[in-house]
A protein has these predicted regions:
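Small beta-barrel nucleic-acid-binding modules, principally OB-folds
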Residues: 47-68
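HotDog/MaoC-like acyl-thioester-processing domains
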Residues: 65-66, 76-136
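Hot-dog-fold acyl-thioester-processing enzymes
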Residues: 1-51, 109-136
């Protein structure tokens, strides 16, 4: 069983990610990052990318801006025959400080929880290949 399996992804949000004035990044971008987390979990558990079926809940808790460094985590909390329930979090760890100078940034200690969600992904039984795809 893979309950408790956690994966992590870190990245910097770029100016291209900004969707609103003031370099604000839309919350949907966080959901896109969660999609990558879920895909990695599916490959690790079943050797297949599977399909993200949907969210049971999503909470947008803090804004994200271009230049922020974020860390996304996903943990499998329940394993069904073909479905897996995942707890997802997106944390802001570094934030630019252009008010100080053009290249200043702050390490956020503690990090700021930006988005929290729970969702389910499904891997068809006939697509199960074992952990990491090593079954076939």
């Amino acid at each position: 069983m893979s309950e408790g399996l956690t994966v992590e992804l870190r990245m910097r949000l770029s100016a291209a990610d900004a969707h609103y004035g003031g370099n604000l990044v839309d919350g949907a971008h966080g959901l896109e990052i969660f999609g990558d987390i879920v895909t990695e979990l599916a490959v690790r558990t079943d050797g297949d990318e599977g399909l993200f079926a949907g969210y049971a809940k999503v909470e947008f808790l803090a804004p994200m801006y271009a230049g922020d460094f974020v860390r996304a985590t996903g943990t499998i909390v329940k394993m069904g025959n073909t479905s897996r329930t995942v707890a997802l979090e997106l944390w802001k760890e570094i934030s630019p400080r252009t008010d100080v100078n053009d290249s200043a940034a702050d390490l956020l200690d503690p990090p700021v929880l930006v988005t929290r969600a729970e969702g389910t992904y499904v891997v068809k039984r006939e697509h199960h290949r074992g952990p990491g795809g090593q079954g076939e």
